Amino acid sequence: MSNNQTLFERAQRTIPGGVNSPVRAFRSVGGTPRFVARAQGAYFWDADGKRYIDYIGSWGPMIVGHVHPDVLAAVQRVLADGFSFGAPTEAEIEIAEEICKLVPSIEQVRMVSSGTEATMSALRLARGFTGRSRIVKFEGCYHGHADSLLVKAGSGLLTFGNPTSAGVPADVAKHTTVLEYNNVAALEEAFAAFGGEIAAVIVEPVAGNMNLVRGTPEFLNALRALTAKHGAVLIFDEVMCGFRVALGGAQQHYGITPDLTCLGKVIGGGMPAAAFGGRGDIMSHLAPLGDVYQAGTLSGNPVAVAAGLATLRLIQAPGFHDALADKTRRLADGLAAEARAAGVPFSADAIGGMFGLYFTEQVPASFADVTKSDIERFNRFFHLMLDAGVYFAPSAYEAGFVSSAHDDATLDATLDAARRAFAALRA
């Protein structure tokens, strides 16, 4: 029995399902999860000592690679001064200033500890600001595990094949309307029917939890116009795509200004940190200024802030995002070319440092399109690549991530492994 198997059996005795987040359990693809012993750059090593090229990067945060020396040094500098205070620090101001500088739509920002906290708090704030209750979200977009958002949610729920969650009261779910992603007609119909009831529309402008699906400019511009017309708050959930699609996030890429933005992953540099922010007139409704309550013991944790600040400064290097996008596009195009050469139905897409792999002929534009993927073939491909030392997301419903640490050698090795994997799929 391998060390990974031994650890998984041991974990299941004290941790539900053996993991602390469902997608890690390999339920979708089968087999034994890899337990990580250490990581460096573009690689990690499992409990059996095997090295893998890592295309998950902690599900997005590791944009500069694992254990970047600048991030490590920043964390080491603050550790000796204390881990957590429950009181303000100068570093909290510094990271807030950095976020507001990089994302101009954010006039004020509040730090939290997870993406779920960011979206949950942004929705409460939107409801408090508008005095309305209804929320609109989109099928396949995942915004964390708050009750009002677990309505046909994507991401982890898809991994174990359950489109809703037990424990969410019907009285909570009824305030959430779910529409088709990239469907402008459905959006217009919803606003015509109950636009005056909508507190907020929350959307991933680049979705990453039903695999990678881009919002179309037409769809996102319609969102901006309709929310403005009806007095609803437009929330961009950029927890995943923020600072990855572009330095200023997807909103910079598309040239669209939301009212509120949720951030996470990259702003913690691998530590637990997230944030939500936006228009000052909306943010002023937060306690202690306003009557919308939000708080957190570990919000603005000094260790997480140090890692986040170091990461945000690194990604501002000239040409950083152009180089990252070039690497990611080379990977996606290379995988598609290898599949085409092998005669395997497959498509791929990339934007910034995110990519999607689909066992379909066409790149999907909606959740319904994603569900047409050949899941059995994806699972075989996943394990062939895993055996070759390449770690893609263990689910056909998750995007992948490239970091600045992925160099030509890692990309070449990945494409060589893919050539063999696609040949095996054809056989």
UniProtKB/Swiss-Prot annotation:
Q: Where in the cell is it found?
A: Cytoplasm
| Positions of modified residues (N6-(pyridoxal phosphate)lysine) | K265
For this UniProt record, give its keywords in alphabetical order, as a comma-separated list. Cytoplasm, Isomerase, Porphyrin biosynthesis, Pyridoxal phosphate
Q: GO cellular component terms?
A: cytoplasm
Cofactor names: pyridoxal 5'-phosphate
What's the superkingdom here?
Bacteria
- A single GO molecular function term of this UniProt record: glutamate-1-semialdehyde 2,1-aminomutase activity
Q: Which reaction does it catalyse?
A: (S)-4-amino-5-oxopentanoate = 5-aminolevulinate
**EC number(s) recorded for this UniProt protein:** 5.4.3.8
> Any keyword Ubl conjugation?
no
Instruction: Give the enzyme's main class according to its UniProt record, as a single word.
Output: isomerase
Under which pathway is this protein filed? Porphyrin-containing compound metabolism; protoporphyrin-IX biosynthesis; 5-aminolevulinate from L-glutamyl-tRNA(Glu): step 2/2
User: Tell me, which GO biological process terms does this entry list?
Assistant: protoporphyrinogen IX biosynthetic process
Task: Give the matching PANTHER family.
Answer: GLUTAMATE-1-SEMIALDEHYDE 2,1-AMINOMUTASE, GLUTAMATE-1-SEMIALDEHYDE 2,1-AMINOMUTASE 1, CHLOROPLASTIC-RELATED
Quaternary structure (record): Homodimer.
Query: What family name appears in the similarity comment?
Result: Belongs to the class-III pyridoxal-phosphate-dependent aminotransferase family. HemL subfamily.
Q: What is this protein called?
A: Glutamate-1-semialdehyde 2,1-aminomutase
The taxonomy runs: Bacteria, Pseudomonadati, Pseudomonadota, Betaproteobacteria, Burkholderiales
